[in-house]
Amino acid sequence: MSRFGFCCKWLNDPSETGGMKVNAVDRDINGRSTTMRWLREHKEEAEQRQWDIMNHNARAALLMVERVGAMVPERRMVRLGSEMLQGYTEPSWIDWWQRQEIQDHCEKIFAPVGEAARRLGVRLSFHPGQFCVLASEADEIVERSILEFEYHADMARWMGYGSSWHDHGFKINVHLSGKGGPAKFLRTLGKLSPEARNLIAIENDEMTNGIDVTLAVAEHCALTLDIHHHWINSGEYITPADPRARRVVESWRGARPALHYSVSREDILVDHDTGTRPDLGQLLDRGYRKQKLRAHSDFLWNTAVTDWALTFSEDWDIQVEAKGKNLATDQLHQQWLNQQ
């Protein structure tokens, strides 16, 4: 069964792509956060703020899963946000988070999220941010990155995932970042917990480590294919039949592979024909820069590019990374329905 998912937040209006308003509908389904500066400057209130945010965010994740789980089966896929637990890997807070009573409470409040996802058939994932660089040449950066990745593995473990290879399709997605390349990444992989190794998925990058590089680790972990990144990297509209795409499928060892999809921003490619795929070579010749073209669109404005993305839908689940979140995924789903 095809699945089409979105990332992290539920939007009710296109204006919310620029950030959720304080009085927005569904604040309870979206996460809250604070800053390390606020926590430092309000020491007497800091622990209570941490408790409030962790409880809100676990509850929000459950509500998100339940809402996605009430959608038609092909829409039951969502990425959960990384900012669930504030400062989990920060030196000033790491000991607090590792206290047994805190860990026990986290397991208690996150377990219902995983239970609901499995009951409702919702595929979940995480995506640590750009500072998670598992192939860095600097060992201190790698150690910090391991902490960050294991933070996501802890949340997945509390939700009941990680005991087997991508159980229920769960993945923790990260780029193969760092000048150490595949060799350094594989050394780092051996330092991760069994749950983290079971759930890690490596994504091709748009500027440096493309598909040909990530395939070097395909025998050791699942790969995520980001087709927008690949287009930025190579100018190619790769097909599902491409041998490289088939190797990505094989890396999942029977689990359903995941694909990331977006398109260059509509305010960059202004007046581009919505029924014609952009040609990267022509755009570069006209003075466009990859640094601008790589940015994710708000919505899936180019139907020709979406038609291409949908050629993968038979064998892949598609995660929409457009800033329009669920609203952008509505567009993808409707275009898919029109083809049925």
Predicted regions and their residues:
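Eukaryote-skewed repeat-based solenoidal scaffolds used as protein-protein interaction platforms
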Residues: 142-222, 228
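Short, acidic/turn-prone active-site loops that include or flank metal/cofactor-
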Residues: 227-235
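Conserved, mostly hydrophobic/aromatic
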Residues: 127, 226, 318
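Core alpha/beta catalytic barrel or barrel-like domain that forms the active/cofactor pocket
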Residues: 81-83, 124-129, 165-176
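Alpha/beta catalytic barrel-like cores
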Residues: 1-123, 132-146, 150, 154, ...
